[in-house]
Amino acid sequence: VQRRVEAEAAALFRHAVAARSAWLGQRIAAEALARSADLTERAWQLGEGRLAETLAARRLAHEAQLAAQSARLDAREAYWRLMLDAHRLWALDEDAHPGHHPP
């Protein structure tokens, strides 16, 4: 039982680390696409680009931002699940009252 619990905890930790890494990567990509969309819009304003290209770039930037926000939620969920399983959020009855077992 102890090995199973340790293996589950290790897997949960790896998942939390991977989720955070994925979120950071998504955030960097979203920031880059937002800068690209800004430049594309500026080119259109100066008459050097087409509206369709500008709108497509803006759409991609918005989709990347949405993906980054979703990845951030996934990372936070993984982190808080890890904290919950580690009993870092609040004391369980057994932790607060050793020897007392609820009915």
What do these predicted ranges mean?
Residues 1-67, 74-85:
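Amphipathic alpha-helical coiled-coil segments
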